[in-house]
Regions:
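P-loop NTPase motor-domain active sites and their immediate coupling elements
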Residues: 1-135
Length: 135
């Protein structure tokens, strides 16, 4: 992430899209998607504060330089999806969860406990007032 910011700075651009317009085809940088498949395992495997700090930093700064993050967990508890992570990852998707508590942990609202499975989900985009059911 920092290397990408250093690359953008000499061209006086603020994001990856502007950079890719200014450079030749061979020098363009791709968008990178970082997928953390089991956040609970990562949070429990080492220094929780360090993991939380790294995720927060990526969530705050990385989008401008073409890095996007998907966090997934089978266990949506407040020990895994901390308040700091929730505050910095504003767009959320929830598939079927076991309880209203789990739904609130992910989406800050109930409803995910009533989903049907097979791709049925609630999507809560940045800035929205309510989640949208999609499949």
């Amino acid at each position: 992430m920092e290397r990408r910011y250093s690359t953008l700075k000499p061209l006086n651009v603020r994001n990856l899209e502007e950079y890719n317009v200014k450079v030749s085809l061979k020098d363009r940088m791709p968008v990178i998607v970082i997928i953390i498949d089991e956040l609970a395992d990562l949070m429990m495997s080492g220094n929780k504060k360090e993991v939380e700090s790294a995720i927060t930093r990526i969530a705050q700064k990385a989008r401008a330089v073409g890095l996007h993050m998907i966090l997934a967990t089978q266990r949506p508890s407040v020990d895994v999806i901390t308040g700091l992570i929730k505050a910095n990852v504003p767009s959320r998707v929830a598939f079927t969860v076991a309880s209203q508590v789990d739904s609130r942990t992910v989406l800050d609202t109930i409803g995910a406990e009533d989903l049907l499975g097979r791709g049925d989900m609630l999507y809560f985009p940045t800035g929205a007032m309510a989640s949208t059911r999609i499949q």
